[in-house]
Amino acid sequence: MIDQSAFIHPSAIVEDGAIIHADVHVGPFCVIGPQVEIGARTVLESHVVVTGITRIGEDNQIYPFASLGDVNQDLKYAGEPTRVEIGHRNRIRESVTIHRGTIQGGEVTRVGSDNLLMVNAHVAHDCTVGSHCIMANNATLGGHVAVDDYAIIGGMTAVHQFCVIGAYVMVGGCSGVAQDVPPFVIAQGNHATPFGLNIEGLKRRGFDHAALHAIRAAYKIIYRSGKTLDEAKPELQALAQEHQVVNTFLDFLLRSQRGIIR
C-alpha cells in the first residue's frame, strides 16, 4: 500500500506488499522490498535499499547507499524471517548498514529514535541501539551489542559481540571495546580503558550538582577503591539509597556478562 501523498521517484522500485505511509519521499534508484513498512514523512534520498522484514518509523532522513534490513553476516543464518525495527527522527547517513536479527539472538535488530548514524556506521544482527545516540563515521557494532541512550561512539571504533555500552558513555575514536562500558564513563584505546566520567556531556543533559557528585562517588567506588565488583556493590547500594542515579550503575552491573572495562 502506497499512500497517495507519498512521492516515489520513477526510477525507484517499490515491490508489491510494501507499506509506504503519508508524505514519504522515496528518491531516485531506491529499492524497497515487499515486507517493508516506512512511516510518515520519512525521506529516502537516493540509492537506498530497504529489504527483509523492516519497519521504519516517522520523520527519518536516510541518505544515499544506506542498506537496511539485509541478510546478516552470521554464518548460522539460514534465511529465517528475522527483522529490523527503526524508530523515529533518526538521521542515517551514507552507506550505513543495519542487518536483520537471528533466531538465536531474539530475531530483531532495533534502533530507537533521534539517533545520528554517520557515514559507514554498521549495526550488526541482534543489536539494540537506544535513543539519542551518535555513532561516528565507520563505527562498528558486532552482533548482539547493546548501546544505551545518549551514548556516543567515536569514529572507526569497533565494539565486540555481546558488549554493552552504557547510557551517556563516550567512546573515543579508533578504540576497540571488548568488555562492557559502564554508564557515564569515557572510554578510549585498544583495548578500551576508562578515562574518567563524561561530565561535560552530563551537564549538557541537565544533570545537577548532586547527581554529578553521586556519579563521581560511584565511579571512585568501582574504579579507585581497589575492591572487586562484588565487594563494591554494598557501598553502591548504600549510596543509591540517597541518590537514585546510582541505581543506573547497579542495574548495569546486573546486566553485564563480559565484565567491565578496567
UniProtKB/Swiss-Prot annotation:
Disulfide bonds: none annotated. GO terms for cellular component: cytoplasm; membrane. The keyword Lipid biosynthesis applies. It comes from the Bacteria. It is found in: Cytoplasm. GO terms for molecular function: acyl-[acyl-carrier-protein]-UDP-N-acetylglucosamine O-acyltransferase activity. Pathway: Glycolipid biosynthesis; lipid IV(A) biosynthesis; lipid IV(A) from (3R)-3-hydroxytetradecanoyl-[acyl-carrier-protein] and UDP-N-acetyl-alpha-D-glucosamine: step 1/6. Its EC number is 2.3.1.129. Pfam families: Acetyltransf_11, Hexapep. It catalyses: a (3R)-hydroxyacyl-[ACP] + UDP-N-acetyl-alpha-D-glucosamine = a UDP-3-O-[(3R)-3-hydroxyacyl]-N-acetyl-alpha-D-glucosamine + holo-[ACP]. Keywords: Acyltransferase, Cytoplasm, Lipid A biosynthesis, Lipid biosynthesis, Lipid metabolism, Repeat, Transferase. The keyword Protein transport does not apply. GO terms for biological process: lipid A biosynthetic process. Belongs to the transferase hexapeptide repeat family. LpxA subfamily. HAMAP family: LpxA. Involved in the biosynthesis of lipid A, a phosphorylated glycolipid that anchors the lipopolysaccharide to the outer membrane of the cell. Homotrimer. This is Acyl-[acyl-carrier-protein]--UDP-N-acetylglucosamine O-acyltransferase. The gene is lpxA.
